[in-house]
């Protein structure tokens, strides 16, 4: 079963991702829900995850910086960054640092599910080689 971490300083956004996706059907489970980047890094050190779904704009440690640290801890972790801001610069920075994908809010859960499936498929391909 794949392990997922959700990181968003907006409780309703994090809860929406948790509740609007049938994780069991995807053979995945939410193991961490964090509300800032620092707690996400701490949680990841305690229990590694396969996929991080994170907001970009957060106090303390933003999603870009958190992603950079997460990839330092586990270079194989896949990251999908989300943002309410449609700034190309965010997407560019996210992809340059190694994030798998960038999605704008408001979230289309069907689209997010497809991106999660793509991440899982990539993980499977990496295991084959």
Which residue ranges define each predicted feature?
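Conserved acidic segment of CheY-like receiver
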Residues: 2-13, 17-18, 52
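Residues at the starts of beta-strands that form the adenosine-phosphate
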Residues: 3, 30, 78
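A generic structural motif
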Residues: 25-31
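Conserved Asp/Asn-Gly motif in the active-site loop of CheY-like receiver
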Residues: 31-38
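CheY-like receiver
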Residues: 41-129
């Amino acid at each position: 079963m794949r392990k997922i971490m959700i990181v968003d300083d907006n409780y309703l956004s994090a809860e929406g991702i948790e509740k609007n996706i049938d994780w069991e059907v995807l053979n995945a489970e939410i193991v961490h829900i964090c509300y800032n980047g620092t707690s996400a890094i701490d949680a990841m050190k305690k229990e590694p995850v396969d996929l991080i779904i994170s907001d970009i704009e957060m106090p303390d440690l933003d999603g870009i910086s958190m992603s950079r640290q997460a990839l330092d801890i586990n270079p194989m972790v896949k990251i999908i960054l989300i943002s309410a801001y449609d700034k190309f610069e965010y997407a560019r920075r996210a992809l340059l640092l190694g994030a798998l994908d960038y999605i704008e809010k408001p979230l289309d859960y069907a689209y997010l599910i497809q991106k999660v499936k793509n991440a899982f498929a990539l993980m499977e391909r990496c295991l084959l080689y």
